[in-house]
């Protein structure tokens, strides 16, 4: 189902599920990347299992493998924008704007004081995110404060996948001299509707303590 339109409409108006407690993502401090593989976590028990996460970080021979970034700084996810045509003119009926879709969101952040080798391995992930124009084979999980992970439940509501990302780019290093950090700017894109089925789960361990095996 599109986030914009459900066709045909229901026989009557549906309800709006109440949110009993506010859900704040707070700060994203690390990211976990993997190839598209919706069934890497078999169920809710596996998803909150420290052993399951560590096993996926240490797998080297299949597409269920995960990799975790160093700490990231300043990560922001802008709200997507509505794409419209016309409005208040003769190009549309009664001058009503036509809604054509939802635009992409460009996620930006920085990684401080990493080696050239680490930056290059992140760039290899970028290759997975732009196999050809408009095609990606990589997803991302967001690791938040309070030991939480944000993931994609998908339309079925029972998956534990990451969010599809496109065009992951790591720039050249930036340095402003004495008593400053060396910085890499990083960004990727997510298509309109990316967050329709997001889930938020506090894990019984600190996922930001996880690390990749030695290369």
Positions of predicted regions on the chain:
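Structured, beta-strand-rich domain cores
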Residues: 83-158
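Generic hydrophobic, helix-prone segments enriched in Leu/Val/Ile
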Residues: 29-32, 70-72, 121-130, 168, ...
């Amino acid at each position: 189902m599109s986030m914009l339109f459900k066709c045909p409409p229901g026989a009557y108006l549906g309800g709006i599920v109440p949110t009993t407690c506010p859900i704040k993502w707070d700060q994203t401090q690390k990211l976990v990347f993997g190839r598209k593989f919706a069934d890497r976590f078999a169920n809710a028990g596996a998803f909150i299992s420290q052993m399951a996460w560590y096993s996926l970080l240490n797998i080297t021979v299949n597409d269920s493998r995960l990799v975790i970034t160093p700490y990231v700084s300043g990560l922001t996810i802008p709200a997507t924008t509505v794409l419209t045509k016309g409005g208040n003119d003769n190009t549309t009926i009664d001058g009503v704007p036509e809604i054509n879709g939802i635009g992409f969101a460009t996620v930006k952040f920085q990684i401080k004081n990493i080696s050239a080798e680490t930056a290059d391995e992140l760039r290899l992930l970028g290759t997975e995110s732009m196999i050809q124009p408009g095609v990606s084979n990589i997803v991302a999980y967001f690791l938040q404060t309070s030991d939480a992970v944000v993931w994609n439940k998908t339309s079925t509501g029972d998956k534990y996948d990451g969010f599809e990302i496109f065009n992951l780019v790591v720039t050249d290093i930036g340095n402003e001299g004495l008593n400053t950090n060396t910085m890499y700017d990083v960004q990727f894109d997510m298509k309109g509707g990316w967050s329709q089925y997001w889930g938020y789960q506090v894990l019984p361990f600190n996922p930001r303590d996880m690390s990749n095996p030695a290369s």
